From Swiss-Prot:
Belongs to the MsrP family. InterPro entries: MsrP, OxRdtase_Mopterin-bd_dom, OxRdtase_Mopterin-bd_sf, TAT_signal. It comes from Escherichia coli (strain K12). This is Protein-methionine-sulfoxide reductase catalytic subunit MsrP. GO terms for molecular function: metal ion binding; molybdopterin cofactor binding; oxidoreductase activity, acting on a heme group of donors; oxidoreductase activity, acting on a sulfur group of donors, quinone or similar compound as acceptor. Its EC number is 1.8.5.-. Binds 1 Mo-molybdopterin (Mo-MPT) cofactor per subunit. The oxidation state of Mo is +5. Is inactive in the presence of the tungsten-substituted form (W-MPT) of the cofactor. Part of the MsrPQ system that repairs oxidized periplasmic proteins containing methionine sulfoxide residues (Met-O), using respiratory chain electrons. Thus protects these proteins from oxidative-stress damage caused by reactive species of oxygen and chlorine. MsrPQ is essential for the maintenance of envelope integrity under bleach stress, rescuing a wide series of structurally unrelated periplasmic proteins from methionine oxidation, including the primary periplasmic chaperone SurA and the lipoprotein Pal. The gene is msrP. PANTHER family: PROTEIN-METHIONINE-SULFOXIDE REDUCTASE, PROTEIN-METHIONINE-SULFOXIDE REDUCTASE CATALYTIC SUBUNIT MSRP. Keywords: Metal-binding, Molybdenum, Oxidoreductase, Periplasm, Signal. Residues 1-44 form the signal peptide. One of its GO terms (cellular component) is outer membrane-bounded periplasmic space. Induction: Is induced at protein level by hypochlorous acid (HOCl), a powerful antimicrobial released by neutrophils, but not by H(2)O(2). Induction by HOCl is dependent on the presence of a functional YedV/YedW two-component system.
Amino acid sequence: MKKNQFLKESDVTAESVFFMKRRQVLKALGISATALSLPHAAHADLLSWFKGNDRPPAPAGKALEFSKPAAWQNNLPLTPADKVSGYNNFYEFGLDKADPAANAGSLKTDPWTLKISGEVAKPLTLDHDDLTRRFPLEERIYRMRCVEAWSMVVPWIGFPLHKLLALAEPTSNAKYVAFETIYAPEQMPGQQDRFIGGGLKYPYVEGLRLDEAMHPLTLMTVGVYGKALPPQNGAPVRLIVPWKYGFKGIKSIVSIKLTRERPPTTWNLAAPDEYGFYANVNPYVDHPRWSQATERFIGSGGILDVQRQPTLLFNGYAAQVASLYRGLDLRENF
């Protein structure tokens, strides 16, 4: 893609605009302006690499063994590893994009327990080693689109969620899948202090319809760039649903429960008119306070190289997933 050297001011400052708008939601939850501005040092750290300056590499995780199936490889330009692991939303560790990388080292990911329960014939529990050894791992290069209208392309490593669910044998009553993040206030400052964590109700919870969870694209993710996930990216295991906005990609999962009824989800509870259950990437359905028609791709350049590009329906995965929503009004079911 040819670089646009004549960026509009809105292209360069869009992140501050979107962050201020997200702050409006958090303010409605009772979070003060002072708290929302902390910590200021994170801004300087973040801007250092947006200006093209060198940053220390993300903490190295354990190297993983994985295959690279041709079906999941492509020629999309990758977002550099330091940006994938240095520009994150993980409010359990703070509101600024650099806070997770700065603060998530406190999260203990081994030992770890992931329980699969609910409407299943065979409930099961996985430990830390099971997450990387029980299923063949594969690298998948996926687009990632945040609801804040920025995007990345990331080489995730993991296994299809449907393989895990198949072991548990969902019953005929199972219609939805509910996910839950670890609740560990002593390790996650945002869970301990509502000002640091944006006033959200914790633990963070998410959900999918069962057919969405069983789709081949839906990935239980344990690594990135060839190594185990760093804590700020959701170690030791997170969800990636590439046709949905990033907040559906729940991190540091400890519970998967199959249910009869649609489960609650964190951002929908916080602002139901702004964050729907489905959260499918859709350039034709705007957020109430900003457009979703375009996005800023975070690539290898500095802030002056940031590109605005059209957002693709279902984030470019329409051919694979559009049939899941046949007959569903995507404006009503956003």
